[in-house]
Amino acid sequence: MTGAPPYNPQSPTQQPRFPVYSPPNKNRSYYPNNDQYQQHAPQTPPAFAPQPSLSRSPHYSHAPSPLPATLPPLNGGAPPPGHHPEPSSQYQTHSSAGTPQFSLPRPYSASMMSSNGASSYNHSTASHAHPSARLESLSQSPPKKETEPLYPIGGNGAPGYSSSMMREPRPASPPRETKHARAADPMSFASILSGPTEETSPIKQPSLPEALPGPATTITPAPPTLAPVPARRRLTPPPVTHALPPTSQLKVKEPEPISPAALPRLEKKPSAEKRRRNVEQEPKSAEALPVASTHGAFEPTKAARVSNRKTLTERDAEAINKIIAEIDNADKSDVESPGFEVEYGRYMVKSKKRALDAEKAEGIRRKRRRHDFLVKLGKTFEKQANAGVDRFRAANEASVIAEVQAKEIQDEKERKKDMQRKRRRENTVRLEMQKKLEAERKANKANDAAEKAKFLREAERAQRKIKSTKRALEGVTSPEEIGEVTPLAPNLEGGTTSSFHIGRSSPSRRKSGRSGTSRPKKSKEQKQAEKDAAEAAYAAMENDEPLPLAPKEDPRKETVKKEAKGARSKETTPAPVSAFESKGYNQIYEQIWRDIARKDIPKVYRIKTLSLSTRQENLRKTAQLASKQSRKWQERTNKSMKDTQARAKRTMREMMSFWKRNEREERDLRRLAEKQEIESAKKAEAEREANRQKRKLNFLISQTELYSHFIGRKIKGAGADSSGDTAVDGSDETIQPGKADHTIDLPPTVADVGAKVTNFEDLDFDAEDETALRQAALANAQNAVKEAQERARAFNAEENPMAALDEGELNFQNPTSLGDIEISQPKMLTAKLKEYQLKGLNWLVNLYEQGINGILADEMGLGKTIQSISVMAYLAEVHNIWGPFLVIAPASTLHNWQQEITKFVPDIKVLPYWGSAKDRKVLRKFWDRKHITYTKESEFHVLVTSYQLVVLDSQYFQKVKWQYMILDEAQAIKSSQSSRWKNLLGFHCRNRLLLTGTPIQNNMQELWALLHFIMPTLFDSHDEFSEWFSKDIESHAQSNTKLNEDQLRRLHMILKPFMLRRVKKHVQQELGDKVEKDVFCDLTYRQRAYYTNLRNRVSIMDLIEKAAVGDEADSTTLMNLVMQFRKVCNHPDLFERAETKSPFSVGYFAETASFVREGQNVDVRYSTRNLIEYNLPRLLCSPSGRIDMAGPGNEHAGFRGKYLQHLMNIFTPENIKRSIDEDGAFSFLRFADTSINEAYEQSHLGVFERAVRRRGQSNRLSHLNVIYDDEEDEKTSKFVLPHSLFNIVQRNDRQAVRNVTVEGYMRDLMNVSEATFERDGLGVIEPSASPAASAPPITISCSGQVALRETQDTFFNVSVRHALFSTPSRQMEQQILEKKLDPAPFSLPPMLPKPISTKGRYTHIEVPSMRRFVTDSGKLAKLDELLRELKAGGHRVLLYFQMTRMIDLMEEYLTYRNYKYCRLDGSTKLEDRRDTVADFQQRPEIFVFLLSTRAGGLGINLTAADTVIFYDSDWNPTIDSQAMDRAHRLGQTRQVTVYRLITRGTIEERIRKRALQKEEVQRVVISGGAAGGVDFNTRNRESRTKDIAMWLADDEQAELIEQKEKEALDRGEVFGAGKGGKKAAQKRKKDLTLDDMYHEGEGNFDDISAKPSGAATPVSTADNFGTPSSTPVPKRGRGRGNGKGSSKRAKTTTERLRLIDGDGGLES
């Protein structure tokens, strides 16, 4: 394995006891790149890894680089030197700078692997080569420096701890003069590396470790003097193994001194003789041994040599020889004395033992290092492998995911195809089974044998088709029977244990080389011939004729011919050996061979090949059968049993499926028969029920008709005879309040004394004879009349007996006949009643006298209010009945009622009953319940209140007996199930009068509720009557047939006595016309995108099915969807408003931990700072750091001011004068109109001071150029004075005359258009682009107070700010006022120019474009054009909306167009409504009145407007009619134009169509018009919900839904009712109508949930206690009422559909 050792920061096998390596010092002449590590080339790992301390070094803690050794150093480092030492110089010496010179060990020689470039440890020499002729493969450990720890070996061979491990690693110290000290322990790591301690070399330098325990001591050497050495001494190896450095290093650094630690420190030195003798006693063979350490540091025949060694001179040689001779002649030491050999031998034994121990310890270390290296190398490879996996994954993960997804999609497609294929096959099996059964049935019935055989063949054919299809369904692809392949019969009893012949096909008879050829294409003629042949064969099969078989053709015939032609040999056939050699003979011979090769050989080859393949096939089959037969003895398995069980199970399944199918068919037939019977029974029952309902209806109409006749004849008297109504005679009697026993004599034509009142439940409607029903109806009508009389008589009888004294005043005993005497207008009424209003008064008075309630249904604007007030005035004036009267009206008309009563009848006192609960409690003190008779002096006569307060204080109202109760806008009680209707019905009142302009709003059930309210006993809420209204009329409307004219006529007859209705065009001729126009708008691109996206999210079919179920939640969801679509049509900003944009601000903003400690006002105007700040020293910002500012710390300021600004300044007056006199540099001043002093002053002033002084100079002469400008006289016009020759701008700034006056009233008078242009904001320009980011100016930061104070003085200088912005300070303005000075000199124009963008001012904040706001909506764009035309024509507009949020957006638009407007919706306070209406009526400058359709369409008079615009229409046309009649009413003198904005191709068109149908209902029922094709919209809840769902569909979807509905109706099913049956059975929590859901949150005055939006018009946060709409809302939460709180549970799919646009709900 090759590669550099992995230098990880912490190896997992390192022991914690190893000390940390101290990194090398960088303070040296060459440290490549100053990086933490160097890359290394791959190397073979050494015998032992570097020291653990080295591995832990942060400078060498990275994985090896895979770069080759030839790469240059990184980051421009110094390249390795080219010098390589000798092969023997294995290790580098330490440098003099103390940097450890470790090199990477290499086990190979320089001849096998070259050097790896730069040293990894920053050596100046890069070679790591070893001796080339080394015999061992172990490498030498690198030498250690002085400060490196030692690793001694203990006595048992285990590694011990050195003293250096207890100290922190320290950096390398500079070299000292001491030599290396050899370790005291010869077995330590440094000791082994420093001396020749090999076992094979007996000649060693002895050392005694036992004598010197502990760390090695150093010996200070003597001065380096050389002595002559004998030749035998030179053969002794050196005491250390350190290689000497090269000569280049010896020149710069001193050589590393040899450590004497290898020598024992003896007190007495041995003599030279003894040492020489011991040396001579060594065997001579030691010279041949390698003089190297244990690890092979030196070669056997080579010693470490020093390059460039100095040659000894003769004098030196003589001195050395002399010293050697003295040593030889010296006395022998104790060591050389005899007897030391024993000690020497003992020492050698111990040395060998130590060497063995060292080798053992080194082997342990080597194994550990090898293990660590392999672990690290494995981790490195694992890391590289993981990196490779990551790279592969990053490169291919996306494609793999895409491939997997594509495969999944393809699998899903295949699965769907398989399912479709399976279904088709199952259908095929079912159909073939039917064919088979039908054929067998026909065969059984057939009499002719041929016909029976034909049917049997069809059955057999169907059976075969069923069998093959079933096999295809089961997935069986093998041959059907074994006998078709083998000649033997199939073994059905037992199985076989071999699968040799299963699933293997016979070998192909064609060669593999021909399998890839494509089939030749057939021509059209061949295809047609094949089709004809197939048809002929099918016809023959049908006729049982034998099929004509064509001769079998060889399919390869043509191919072989073509191949034979192509393969025809062009070479001549070799001539046979013959005696004839003529040319003709050879030609004939070759021709014969060619014919044979072309014709016979391919044929013979084919025959042979076919024969061979047949024989091989037979042999294969025979082998298979033989193999099967030979293994029959192994067939003793349970396969036969399993096959039997499988066949039995399959048979059972087939039987079960057959019987199930048979039972299902029988059950279907039985159900079909039962269904037909039930349908026929239903039809019969429906016919009987229709007859029964018809009799019920006839009874109810007859009863009501008789009552109407009684009342009509009573009111009309004899006048009824002239009208032709002779069914009932009239009567002139009235109810007299004074006599309790008075009765009205019924006419003799209908009076039946013996008639018996019958309950409705006891009547028999099944009888064919209707005589009993007619008698019961007559009796019930008589009883109803009597009850009405008794009720009125009882109310009068309960009056105070004191009223009998004034019986002459209460003239109820002598009523007048309507035909003889007409009631005149009351005198106390200040207004003049019109003719039709006087007739209405007569009708109301007659109703009151008869004790009958009525409905005044005049069209809006005809004066229903004044007619009601005239009735009260009549009762007070004629009959002295002063009340109490109760008027209940919507909240918006309360003030109007109070004002009208006070205005027209001042004698009648009005009590306005509204306000908070405390206010109402005070008002109730005026109710005098003790005195029933109210007089003219009573506290009040009429009480005016609202519907909400009536419900709240119903317990107080029920205690009072009211003479007359008037309900204004009576459609508020259209629901007989509401609490309002029930509370009002329970009040004690003599008569009730309902005022409504629209008696029929949505359906006829509302009209029936009003009739039931006025006559509860007669117009009872019978279910049959309501059912007739809801079903019978609808059935006629759906079938587009005419309604029963007799029933419609009788219905009108019912309504005539109780309801009076007049239309404007019939009674009011002076009232202007009303023109209605539908303005169609198109969707914009944004609206179309929203609309399409919204429709794509919703399934119309699901909505239809849910609507058929009729669930409450689904209905609410549907209405939410309708609202979302209407929002899109109105404006897309109802979903999402355009945001205000601003560039990204690169800066710091003010922050605070808490605003509590910041005080009341926090000034953050100058708290924004730039991210870039220049931090300057405090000295530089102080006066001491600037040479031009004098101060205690600046001594040079005076010098600069004296010499630089005065002596050396060229702008001094003396220098300028001298220069002008000498025509020098300043001679131009004479032409610039500048004096010497002015030039001197300008040189000492800054730019800002000069600009301020320039602004103060007036240029009045230039204005005169306009007057004295003479274009003809060129001399005069171009005349320039010499002293102002260079002043080009001063007198050439020509301006218009209107701009000459820059201030005062004259400028305003001369610039009216410009001032108007600027004031109206017409010059506002929107910027076309904005920067992406902005930042405050870069500031200078200094920590000194002086710099901060100077910065603030500069930025907030009052004089500078006044000059730049021309805004005088508050103190200056106060002084101007106090001293009464002229403000003109102090109001100079600002010096800063106007901003580039007038719209954005000095900022880049972009407000959403109003132009885009207008063009984003098709309606708003069309409205913009329309309002512009109306404004130019002097019209005033009422603008109606359905959504209050749209009103908020419209306020922004009107502000943008500068149209004055006022607003009124459900959130407007009661006291503000009156003032708002009065302002619009009295101030012509108000152009637009914004109103909510439900809030602003009731009871207010807005005749000042002549144009009504419906931004979005209501689906109830009566609401829109009421809204437009606010302007088209009495008092309107101009023509009223109504514009209705409709978005083309959307839901609004369908809503408008539905509204037109409702208008037709009103026309038919009220006016008596034709009823053809009218949809009365009285269907049940589910049908109406389905109609709403149909609005969301387009024309194609609607057509498809209608087609499916028709198909379901043909099947006798209800479309969409098959799902969700359980949901339909759920009980609804609240019967909330679709109309209520649709208008939820629209701002209806009667809606207590209406809240002010506050989006565009600020509203007060205080509780509106003064308005009737401020009803306390129940608290939200569990058990706290019906408040709608936001739920934290997960949203269902239905709820998510409601929140499509993130807006949710129906709130607009």
From Swiss-Prot:
<feature type="compositionally biased region" description="Basic and acidic residues">
    <location>
        <begin position="551"/>
        <end position="571"/>
    </location>
</feature>
<dbReference type="InterPro" id="IPR038718">
    <property type="entry name" value="SNF2-like_sf"/>
</dbReference>
<feature type="compositionally biased region" description="Polar residues">
    <location>
        <begin position="1658"/>
        <end position="1672"/>
    </location>
</feature>
<feature type="domain" description="DBINO">
    <location>
        <begin position="592"/>
        <end position="717"/>
    </location>
</feature>
<dbReference type="GO" id="GO:0042393">
    <property type="term" value="F:histone binding"/>
</dbReference>
<feature type="domain" description="Helicase C-terminal">
    <location>
        <begin position="1422"/>
        <end position="1582"/>
    </location>
</feature>
<feature type="coiled-coil region">
    <location>
        <begin position="395"/>
        <end position="478"/>
    </location>
</feature>
<feature type="compositionally biased region" description="Basic and acidic residues">
    <location>
        <begin position="1692"/>
        <end position="1701"/>
    </location>
</feature>
<feature type="compositionally biased region" description="Polar residues">
    <location>
        <begin position="24"/>
        <end position="37"/>
    </location>
</feature>
<feature type="compositionally biased region" description="Basic residues">
    <location>
        <begin position="1675"/>
        <end position="1691"/>
    </location>
</feature>
<keyword id="KW-0547">Nucleotide-binding</keyword>
<keyword id="KW-0805">Transcription regulation</keyword>
<dbReference type="GO" id="GO:0003677">
    <property type="term" value="F:DNA binding"/>
</dbReference>
<dbReference type="GO" id="GO:0031011">
    <property type="term" value="C:Ino80 complex"/>
</dbReference>
<dbReference type="GO" id="GO:0000781">
    <property type="term" value="C:chromosome, telomeric region"/>
</dbReference>
<dbReference type="GO" id="GO:0034080">
    <property type="term" value="P:CENP-A containing chromatin assembly"/>
</dbReference>
<feature type="domain" description="Helicase ATP-binding">
    <location>
        <begin position="845"/>
        <end position="1017"/>
    </location>
</feature>
<comment type="subunit">
    <text>Component of the INO80 chromatin-remodeling complex.</text>
</comment>
<feature type="compositionally biased region" description="Polar residues">
    <location>
        <begin position="88"/>
        <end position="102"/>
    </location>
</feature>
<dbReference type="GO" id="GO:0005524">
    <property type="term" value="F:ATP binding"/>
</dbReference>
<dbReference type="InterPro" id="IPR014001">
    <property type="entry name" value="Helicase_ATP-bd"/>
</dbReference>
<dbReference type="GO" id="GO:0032006">
    <property type="term" value="P:regulation of TOR signaling"/>
</dbReference>
<dbReference type="InterPro" id="IPR001650">
    <property type="entry name" value="Helicase_C-like"/>
</dbReference>
<dbReference type="GO" id="GO:0140658">
    <property type="term" value="F:ATP-dependent chromatin remodeler activity"/>
</dbReference>
<feature type="compositionally biased region" description="Basic and acidic residues">
    <location>
        <begin position="426"/>
        <end position="463"/>
    </location>
</feature>
<dbReference type="GO" id="GO:0006281">
    <property type="term" value="P:DNA repair"/>
</dbReference>
<dbReference type="InterPro" id="IPR031047">
    <property type="entry name" value="DEXQc_INO80"/>
</dbReference>
<keyword id="KW-0539">Nucleus</keyword>
<keyword id="KW-0067">ATP-binding</keyword>
<feature type="region of interest" description="Disordered">
    <location>
        <begin position="1"/>
        <end position="312"/>
    </location>
</feature>
<dbReference type="InterPro" id="IPR050520">
    <property type="entry name" value="INO80/SWR1_helicase"/>
</dbReference>
<keyword id="KW-0234">DNA repair</keyword>
<keyword id="KW-0010">Activator</keyword>
<dbReference type="GO" id="GO:0016887">
    <property type="term" value="F:ATP hydrolysis activity"/>
</dbReference>
<feature type="compositionally biased region" description="Basic and acidic residues">
    <location>
        <begin position="632"/>
        <end position="646"/>
    </location>
</feature>
<dbReference type="GO" id="GO:0045944">
    <property type="term" value="P:positive regulation of transcription by RNA polymerase II"/>
</dbReference>
<dbReference type="InterPro" id="IPR020838">
    <property type="entry name" value="DBINO"/>
</dbReference>
<feature type="compositionally biased region" description="Low complexity">
    <location>
        <begin position="108"/>
        <end position="122"/>
    </location>
</feature>
<dbReference type="GO" id="GO:0000775">
    <property type="term" value="C:chromosome, centromeric region"/>
</dbReference>
<dbReference type="Pfam" id="PF00271">
    <property type="entry name" value="Helicase_C"/>
</dbReference>
<dbReference type="GO" id="GO:0006366">
    <property type="term" value="P:transcription by RNA polymerase II"/>
</dbReference>
<feature type="compositionally biased region" description="Basic and acidic residues">
    <location>
        <begin position="265"/>
        <end position="285"/>
    </location>
</feature>
